[in-house]
Amino acid sequence: MMDISLKRITSDNYEEISLLEVEEYQEDYIASNMWSLVEAAYNENYVVRGIYLLDKPVGFFMWVKENPHKIAIWRFMIDKIHQNKGLGRNALQIALNEIKKDKEIKEIEICYNPLNPVAKTFYASLGFEEIGMDKDGDDMLALIRVTQ
């Protein structure tokens, strides 16, 4: 079992999280961590977590409670040097478990670029079901219905 954990982002670790990067071809699929941290600082329903392997930062999450019963994962990334090692799968499972601790939550949503070749298979393998494109027609929406 990998020693993966999610940690709150504070004044002590925001810089190391903001320095994480995806591969160049992935940059169109996700906002920078720095921008996400700025958004979270000014929006109280935004939750940010650093993904750590042992004590080393390897990725980032941001999710938003869009209403009392729904959380949307808006950002999820693994640093380019740590991709394809199973870290993302483990981290997402930990994040889903943390989100499900809120007993009001009935839906967990994620969106992704439908042209992203890996996303559909990856998210489906963790229980997300595609429900169609977002209202702008840009991103595929996928959902986990939570049964508590």
Model-derived segments and spans:
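Acetyl-CoA-dependent GNAT
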Residues: 4, 8-74, 79-81, 98, ...
